[in-house]
């Protein structure tokens, strides 16, 4: 469900919202609900026992992290303890220079398991501008989203990349390639 385009989120009644959720849950394995940044007082009433898990998506900046902390606190008070975080719009160069928090730092700050990290990706932005699926084509952002989807829908152990982490010369020389590659070093 996309984020509300209403002038005020309170225009959506909690009872109607729960009915919509029940209908969707009976037809789909997963229902993702987008919400505006933060959690307004009017949105708090929409939280219901129909929601099984909260996945907070935030960018690695102080304002967004504080907002995510407040949202997580409200969710916990409402009894929703299954929470994970996705860190969006990571820039590896900024992380290496210490100008941006790494995804693991954000997850530790929020005291939530890290579901995934999505790098800043011009291809994702271009797809959004052209109203195309971000899953078409090949890009690092698309691959990150696919890994997150796998983590959400399977028990498969999907490794988390570490955008912006410094690697030693030894790590760069002898890092294993993906399964199926002929060479074992890159």
What does each model-found stretch correspond to?
Residues 1-26, 126-130, 134-135:
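P-loop/Walker-type NTP enzyme "switch/lid" segment
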Residues 77-186:
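C-terminal lobe/tail of nucleotide-utilizing enzymes
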Residues 1-10, 28, 40, 99, ...:
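Proteins with a high burden of low-complexity, intrinsically disordered sequence enriched in S/T/G/P/A and R
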Residues 15-26, 30-120, 126:
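Conserved catalytic-core segment of NTP-binding enzymes
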């Amino acid at each position: 469900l996309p984020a509300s385009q209403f002038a005020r989120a309170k225009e959506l009644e909690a009872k109607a919202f729960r009915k919509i959720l029940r209908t969707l849950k009976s037809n789909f394995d997963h229902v993702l609900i987008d919400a505006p940044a933060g959690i307004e007082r009017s949105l708090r009433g929409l939280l219901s026992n129909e929601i099984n898990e909260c996945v907070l998506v935030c960018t690695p900046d102080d304002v967004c992290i504080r907002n995510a902390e407040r949202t997580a606190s409200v969710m916990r008070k409402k009894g929703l303890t299954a929470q994970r975080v996705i860190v969006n719009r990571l820039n590896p160069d900024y992380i290496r220079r210490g100008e941006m928090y790494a995804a693991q730092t954000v997850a530790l700050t929020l005291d939530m398991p890290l579901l995934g990290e999505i790098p800043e990706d011009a291809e994702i932005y271009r797809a959004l501008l052209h109203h195309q699926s971000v899953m078409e084509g090949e890009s690092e952002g698309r691959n990150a989203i696919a890994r997150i989807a796998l983590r959400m829908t399977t028990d498969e152990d999907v490794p988390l990349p570490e955008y912006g982490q410094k690697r030693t010369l030894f790590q760069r020389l002898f890092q294993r390639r993906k399964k199926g590659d002929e060479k074992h070093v890159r």
